[in-house]
């Protein structure tokens, strides 16, 4: 039976009132006689505290709050959960280096408990022996420099399918939805690398549907994550727990089919694929006697899904924002194309070996990370022990948010921070490798420390070869009649922050550098 609006509001008031009482009781029990110097805090609302700031575009709201309070570190109460927000590089460095061990864990989130098979992926696993083992496996086995290089053939093959599609099916008179192209590319690359198959784009396919549902659930708002005492009731009444259980069952079923195919050897390999995919690697590692913690079948599924979900969103969002800014800035676009075509010459295709010479293109990617970070609020950490940040006491079990969006637009850090100018990285030595282990901690698109994203080298390789190929083979512009100031830069917040509206562009084949490949016959 569906709840009426009146009954829903009554239930919400009851839930929030109960939460208020529980918070008050817990505070009274945990109060200490020892005074603490806590970070400043803005006025909050009864019961929910500052939870309203986390709706919509929280990175914008928190950046504005840090600015108006003149507080690079401030404290919030998200429901019954204490939290702090960092908006300056020196504090980010302190959190990710000096206090890395104290801030080594993750909050226990309901979506992670279900969809990460008991929080057993690298992203959501709590600090401890299992997380150390899982991260070591991912870094040394799945995403080592050698392994990332071997996946180059997959990246190139899927990219060439996109280039063939653009060559055969686009014209300047018919704008192309580049957002959809990038989403398909990211899904195809990650699906082949993770599962050894192409992403199923057709309607009715179970794997594609359940992966999309999992991504929606990971990105959604869960009241129990901010009122843990009320989680069982809240998730049951809202239907979220039922939805999570169904998605988990569907994920397990879909993954079981894939794993069984790998074990039995009955899967059909894509022609040309000879290297191990993620499932192959983890099945081999699972048998190793050297693991300090056993790697169960559910752990294996969690690690593979973690790499897929995190990798597709960040790759897609980065490519989308890069091309958005390039078509809005023809001068920068022209300069980037001239560099790519000079380096690649008449060879006819971009190879990953060319990327080291594309200095300006790498500055463009860095500038995009600064102005449009795919993850503007880094995945929150949780303190496992009390620590000190910026002279303030941070109690245990406090959630710690690092607002990279605020740091990227801070006029105290960057000249003309709202201007898209890749040259700022050229003058700062940005023409070298895209070293995201920034010693100044001004640029943190993939986090840092022991919780930094282990897959950033794979994502960067995909972004760089894709962008270089698009610049080499095609001419790009805004659709006829659309001015740069007309392009909507509004965002949608989720696992990665992407454009709210799809990016439509005018594209035509380059007369001098037209793509010619065997993939043309497949499209």
UniProtKB/Swiss-Prot annotation:
SUPFAM superfamilies listed in its UniProt record: Cytochrome P450
- Give the membrane topology: Single-pass membrane protein
Record localization: Endoplasmic reticulum membrane
Which Gene Ontology BP annotations are present?
defense response; serotonin biosynthetic process from tryptophan
Give binding positions for heme: 453
Instruction: Provide the alphabetized UniProt keywords.
Output: Endoplasmic reticulum, Heme, Iron, Membrane, Metal-binding, Monooxygenase, Oxidoreductase, Plant defense, Serotonin biosynthesis, Transmembrane, Transmembrane helix
- InterPro entries in UniProt: Cyt_P450 (IPR001128), Cyt_P450_CS (IPR017972), Cyt_P450_E_grp-I (IPR002401), Cyt_P450_sf (IPR036396)
Q: Which GO terms describe its molecular function?
A: heme binding; iron ion binding; monooxygenase activity; oxidoreductase activity, acting on paired donors, with incorporation or reduction of molecular oxygen
Q: Which cofactor does it need?
A: heme
Task: Provide one Gene Ontology cellular component.
Answer: endoplasmic reticulum membrane
Assigned EC number: 1.14.14.186
The record's induction entry says: Induced by N-acetylchitooligosaccharide elicitor and infection with a compatible race of the rice blast fungus Magnaporthe oryzae. Induced by salt stress, methyl viologen, acifluorfen and cadmium.
> Do you know which Pfam families this protein is assigned to?
p450
Q: What this chain does, per the record? A: Involved in serotonin biosynthesis. Catalyzes the conversion of tryptamine to serotonin. Accumulation of serotonin may play a role in innate immunity.
Q: Say which family it is in.
A: Belongs to the cytochrome P450 family.
State what protein this is by name. Answer: Tryptamine 5-hydroxylase
